[in-house]
Amino acid sequence: MPFEPVSKNIDKPTLLLNPLAPTRCSMKLLKVLAIAGICLCASVTQGAQSVPPAAVSHTALSLAETQQIVDQATLRSVPWTGPESGPSAQPGKYIAFVAEDLRNGGIVGVAQGVREAVRTMGWTLRIFNASGSSAGLTTAFERALASNPDGLILCGSDALGSNAELAQLASRGVPVVAWHAGSKPGPIAGTPVAMNVTTDPVEVARITALGAVAQSHGHAGVVILTDSRFEIATTKSNVMASIIRACQGCTLLEVRNVAISDSGKKMPAITQELLARYGKRWTHALAINDIYFDYAVPALTKAGVPSNGLSLLSAGDGSAPAFLRIQAKIYQTGTVAEPLNQQGWQLVDELNRLFAGRPVSGFVAPVHLVNANNVAFDGGDRFQYDPENGYREIYRRIWKR
């Protein structure tokens, strides 16, 4: 497949997604690295702020009802519920992929899926990495616009914050689809984004919080980690806070705002601070992304917290280190994993429909909670959630490829 990266080594997205490279290392080494976390930073910066959760209400559920919902979310090999028909592959397209930050395993997982699907289509792909900064995003868009794409995928950045750049694409008649660029799946109102591909973030957050309630038998002491720069993150943290507040025996200790791009610098110190402040009252950490735990785990280990002494659950996206921690039973007990590779294929399918003058499919994948009981299935042996539902064959059949 023609593939022209604009960042060094971007043509090897597997390495970016999983620096632990499981196909080249032993499981013993992987588990040691998972305990230690990844990308350990010598510099520790204080100062992420606490934020009050917004008022979102949820009706309290019985423990039996809670457990039933959690069990349903952990089912494996769920049948395909996406599109079965659509236009054949439109020829000769070039796609620009603007990534918020390729240190985010979710974004790189989507990029891998897009790359697979583009290769199947016979199209061309270039990836522009914003590296997690506003200046980087501006530069990435400038380069993407200058490359004159036929279509653009916005991955992990808030669409409303980039609306001026997206409007330039719309004025050229360039279709835009996105991943995690808004608070819900579907078109993003007020922007040219025709389809925001994501599982339902409200349901993702609900399942994550209910997982903590079920684990603790209704007595969880919870800290929530979020990034208020992103609407989807705020939606998730507000819903999780609401679920915990609705649990009579649970305690919402704190909602902490930490920029994902700063997690490497700030999470070690924040983890130490939270341990000192709440002690054994802190039983569960809920985060809007697994990456926070990459940097919290070394601090927990250093503090002598037993691996079962604090339960970490993430409302996205199912990173390789998260799978390793769950398999090894090292702090993290769950992640509501996005089917990242499948969503990459869906993004390409949605663009193909737009190129053909057809409406988007609007498909929303069901929510899936990965835990110790199902982590080995549906792609778990490759440290990802890759549903065993035949999506690749189905899309190839639709595209006549």
Spans of model-derived segments:
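Hinge/cleft segment of the Venus flytrap/periplasmic-binding protein
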Residues: Q49-K93, I244, P339, Q343-R401
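Extracytoplasmic "Venus flytrap"
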Residues: V51-G113, R126-T138, R143, G156-A159, ...
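Structural motif
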Residues: P79-T81, L125-N148, V255-Y278, F293-A296
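An alpha-beta-alpha
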Residues: I95-A99, R103-N104, V114, R206-N257, ...
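Hydrophobic alpha-helical segments within soluble ligand-binding/sensing domains
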Residues: L137, M195-V222, T234-T235, M267-P268, ...
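Flexible loop/hinge segments that line or gate small-molecule binding clefts
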Residues: L160, A164-E203, G221, A320-R325, ...
